[in-house]
Amino acid sequence: MAISALIEEFQKVSASPKTMLAKYKAQGKKAIGCLPYYVPEELVYAAGMVPMGVWGCNGKQEVRSKEYCASFYCTIAQQSLEMLLDGTLDGLDGIITPVLCDTLRPMSQNFKVAMKDKMPVIFLAHPQVRQNAAGKQFTYDAYSEVKGHLEEICGHEITNDAILDAIKVYNKSRAARREFCKLANEHPDLIPASVRATVLRAAYFMLKDEYTEKLEELNKELAAAPAGKFDGHKVVVSGIIYNMPGILKAMDDNKLAIAADDCAYESRSFAVDAPEDLDNGLQALAVQFSKQKNDVLLYDPEFAKNTRSEHVCNLVKESGAEGLIVFMMQFCDPEEMEYPDLKKALDAHHIPHVKIGVDQMTRDFGQAQTALEAFAESL
């Protein structure tokens, strides 16, 4: 299949998650909403259910969620709750709500209260000190509890063999997405910022085996494609999420292609595979989480060395990017607290960057357009 045809298929999925949810429900499958961050989707997949990403939405008018949310909650949390309240996500059979930040922690209880008569809400508490034996055991126990709740929803046991099989499916998918990011950097003429974001976003709304099969086909076509002409600029993007239509249009208009990303919604979520040489599936998933790093949401035992900021700087250099765009989610405390150290490292490495505030309620992207245009001209 041609590259353009494959991209069009991903665009259809990305543009209409509700259609995908309805499709899977029509097949008799149950679906579980997975909120940010680091949900062990393998457990949902192993249960024979469909994991559906719930990371807010763009431009929805908040009405009912304001009754539950403080004004300083990020719009990812508010928009996710709004969709649950207004019926957009009524097809879900439950949701998993991790609590890795100070907004999601109290928000998990808002989800529980708001959804008490509609669907089960599964609480997931990851440990911050996750690398040692106690941290891995904590993660194991937390995942085991999630597994029990999922078994209540699906109506049968989630076997260890099913989890091990799911890990293989997900590792294959993560590898395909990492390869796609590499190929997108090699073909900015074929994969502009909006297309790259669309292809990666589609993973949240498809069963991973189906998604990976289609993505591997796209990767094969990209690998065989000749190098094209690109007269724009390559950049690295960093932040929680940035795929608002206005932002992506502004990047495409100013010929800013993405060489690599340091985003929670994208590469951070598929950077680490689960080991396949362990006999216990839950243990393998706990080990996987223990190896997650370079994320503002996670405790870094080597924080004094500013390892995360150095990681971002190295990402810019190794990808061949000319600069960095920091997309700062409004009211995201971890991102805001990290920025001074990140800026210091970027300046020390003489890496041009621009910081742009993003919000899922934004309707006028004129300010972002101007900032991106000025940044492109400065490169």
From Swiss-Prot:
One of its GO terms (molecular function) is 4 iron, 4 sulfur cluster binding. Involved in the fermentation of L-glutamate via the hydroxyglutarate pathway. Catalyzes the reversible syn-elimination of water from (R)-2-hydroxyglutaryl-CoA to yield (E)-glutaconyl-CoA. The dehydration mechanism involves a transient one electron reduction of the thioester from (R)-2-hydroxyglutaryl-CoA, generating a ketyl radical. Prior to (E)-glutaconyl-CoA formation, the ketyl radical is subsequently reoxidized by electron transfer back to the HgdA-HgdB complex (CompD) to avoid change in oxidation state of the substrate. Belongs to the FldB/FldC dehydratase alpha/beta subunit family. This is (R)-2-hydroxyglutaryl-CoA dehydratase, subunit beta. Its cofactor is [4Fe-4S] cluster; FMN; Mg(2+). One of its GO terms (cellular component) is cytoplasm. The gene is hgdB. Keywords: 4Fe-4S, Cytoplasm, Flavoprotein, FMN, Iron, Iron-sulfur, Lyase, Magnesium, Metal-binding. It comes from Acidaminococcus fermentans (strain ATCC 25085 / DSM 20731 / CCUG 9996 / CIP 106432 / VR4).
